[in-house]
Amino acid sequence: MFPSAHSRFIYFHKENSNPNYHAYDDTRFQVIMMSGLPGSGKDTWIKENLPEYKVISLDELRQEMGIEPGGNQGEIANAAKSLAKEYMRAGESFVWNATNLNKQLRGMLIRLFAAYQAEIRIVYLETSWLELLRRNKTRTEKVPEKVLYRMKNRLEVPTVVEAHRVDFIVN
């Protein structure tokens, strides 16, 4: 129906857009936004599929900054956004590695990335609940099971209208 992925993206992200309008693709670089519960395989997928990309990992920033998971997450988010802006100003592609569990949070980031002319790709990973719990037990930074359960209940699977491209990977 849409002339291009960029035209579809523009249609769903700008008011009063026409689905037949062939939008000029002014994207300059790519941002890959990971999405999925802890233990779904995001880090492994990045290493196997995008080893050459720079990665902004909120988990790694949390560790580097010495902030506990229950601590001030705003500082981590601000540091991550600052790094992302640096990459985007330079026109460098990168991976935004976080859980990105709900549409509202993804939307805020997508608007930021689009403002810098990014082509946005969401990679959503999913695995069975039992496998998720098994992987969590072997993690260095384990997530309490009740927290995982809460996250699972808040999860909103991305839709194809959120980005230029959305990949669904079930493993």
Locate predicted features.
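Conserved GTP-binding G-domain of TRAFAC-class P-loop NTPases and closely related GTPase folds
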Residues: 2, 7-9, 14-23, 28-35, ...
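Generic beta-sheet signal
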Residues: 30-32, 92-96, 120
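Conserved substrate/cofactor phosphate-moiety recognition/catalytic segment
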Residues: 43-94, 101, 129, 133
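Structural signal for conserved beta-strand scaffold positions within catalytic alpha/beta enzyme cores
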Residues: 57, 124, 168-170
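Aromatic/hydrophobic pocket-lining residues that form π-stacking "cages" and hydrophobic walls in ligand
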Residues: 83, 109-111
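Short glycine-/polar-rich loops that comprise or flank the Walker A/P-loop
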Residues: 90-91, 116-121, 161-166
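Acidic, metal-coordinating catalytic cores used for nucleic-acid/nucleotide bond scission
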Residues: 97-109
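Conserved phosphate-donor/acceptor-positioning beta-strand/loop module used by diverse small-molecule
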Residues: 116-135
